[in-house]
C-alpha cells in the first residue's frame, strides 16, 4: 500500500478538485433528461465521432452511460476516464489526446512494415490509399494474416497501454461504460463493463481479423465488435433513458457500385457492420428519443479506404465535420 500511496494521493486530489468544480456549476433542474451515448466504430473515421462528441461536451451535455465499439470503444473509454478526473473538460482533453497520439504514431505503420518484402511495395504508403490496399489484398490471397504478421503486433497496444486509466474507469463516479467484442466461436457479442475494461478488451473490440491478431481474453477469442453490434444499444436502456445520442462513423448509404477489390471489401464491411445496429434501433422503446448524428455527408466524397488514413490533416478534417454535424443536437 505504501508504494502506491503517492499515486493514490494525487488521484484523490484530482477527484476532489473535480468535485469542487462540479459543485460550483449551476444546479441541473430535476427535469433534465437522462441522456446516454452510443459510439459507432469506423477506424480513422472515428475522428468524426471525436469531433461530434467534443461539440456535445463543450455545450454541456452529460451522459449517464456510454456504449462503444472499435474506435468508438476507445473514444468511450477515454471520455469516461477524463470525465471522472475533470468533468466534460477532462473528457474532451482525454479524447483529443488519443487522436493526437494516433496521428503522431502513424498507427498502421507496423502493418505496413510486414508487407515490405512484396514487389513494388513501399512501406511509406498510407493504408488509406487505393494502391496500398491493392497490395494488402494481393498478399492475403497468398498468405494468412498470421503469416503476414508473425509476431502478432498490434500498433494500438502500446498507445492504449500508455493512455488507459483503469482506476478512473472503475471509479464509482464514472459513467457506465460498455464495450462490445465478437466471440469468434459463438458469433455473439460479448459486452464488457467498467469493471472488466482493459487494454486487451479495447484491442478485441477493434480487431479486424484480416489485419490484427485475434485477441484472447480468459480463454475466449474475440474479433471486432462491429460484426455483432455496432454499437450495443441494449445495455444503455436500463435504467431507461430519455434520450439516446448515436454518433455514426460509417455512412449508411453510398452512391454507385464499388469496382476495385479494396472498395468492395470495405463496402461489404460497412453493410455487415450496419445490420446489427439497424436491428437494435428498430427495437428501441418509443419513450426513448433517438438523436442520430450522421456521418454520411462528411464521408460521401472520401474513398472507402479512407478509414485507414491516419494523416493528421485528414483526422482534423473529420473532427471539424463532426463538430458541425453535432450542432443541431446541442440545440435540442
Model-derived segments and their meaning:
Residues 2-69, 77-332:
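Patatin-like phospholipase
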Amino acid at each position: 500500500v505504501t508504494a502506491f500511496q503517492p499515486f493514490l494521493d494525487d488521484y484523490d486530489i484530482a477527484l476532489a478538485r473535480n468535485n469542487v468544480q462540479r459543485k460550483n456549476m449551476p444546479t441541473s433542474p430535476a427535469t433534465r433528461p437522462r441522456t446516454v451515448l452510443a459510439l459507432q466504430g469506423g477506424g480513422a473515421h472515428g475522428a468524426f465521432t471525436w469531433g461530434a462528441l467534443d461539440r456535445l461536451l463543450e455545450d454541456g451535455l452529460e451522459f449517464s452511460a456510454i456504449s462503444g465499439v472499435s474506435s468508438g470503444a476507445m473514444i468511450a473509454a477515454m471520455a469516461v476516464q477524463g470525465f471522472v478526473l475533470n468533468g466534460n473538460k477532462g473528457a474532451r482533453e482525454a479524447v483529443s489526446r488519443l487522436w493526437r497520439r494516433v496521428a503522431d504514431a502513424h498507427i498502421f505503420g507496423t502493418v505496413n512494415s510486414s508487407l515490405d518484402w512484396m514487389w513494388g511495395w513501399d512501406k511509406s504508403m498510407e493504408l488509406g490509399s487505393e494502391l496500398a490496399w491493392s497490395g494488402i489484398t494481393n498478399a492475403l490471397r497468398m498468405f494468412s494474416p498470421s503469416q503476414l504478421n508473425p509476431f502478432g503486433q498490434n500498433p494500438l497496444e502500446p498507445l492504449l497501454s500508455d493512455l488507459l486509466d483503469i482506476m478512473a474507469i472503475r471509479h464509482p463516479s464514472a459513467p457506465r461504460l460498455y464495450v462490445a467484442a465478437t466471440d469468434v466461436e459463438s458469433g455473439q457479442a460479448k459486452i464488457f463493463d467498467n469493471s472488466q475494461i482493459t487494454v486487451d478488451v479495447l484491442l478485441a473490440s477493434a480487431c479486424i481479423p484480416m489485419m490484427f491478431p485475434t485477441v484472447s481474453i480468459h480463454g475466449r477469442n474475440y474479433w471486432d465488435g462491429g460484426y455483432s453490434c455496432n454499437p450495443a444499444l441494449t445495455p444503455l436502456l436500463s435504467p431507461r433513458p430519455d434520450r439516446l445520442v448515436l454518433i455514426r462513423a460509417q455512412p449508411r448509404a453510398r452512391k454507385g457500385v464499388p469496382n476495385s477489390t479494396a472498395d468492395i471489401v470495405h463496402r461489404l464491411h460497412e453493410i455487415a457492420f450496419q445490420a446489427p445496429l439497424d436491428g437494435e434501433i428498430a427495437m428501441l422503446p418509443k419513450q426513448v428519443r433517438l438523436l442520430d448524428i450522421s456521418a454520411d455527408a462528411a464521408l460521401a466524397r472520401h474513398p472507402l479506404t479512407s478509414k485507414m488514413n491516419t494523416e493528421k490533416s485528414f483526422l482534423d478534417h473529420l473532427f471539424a465535420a463532426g463538430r458541425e454535424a453535432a450542432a443541431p443536437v446541442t440545440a435540442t
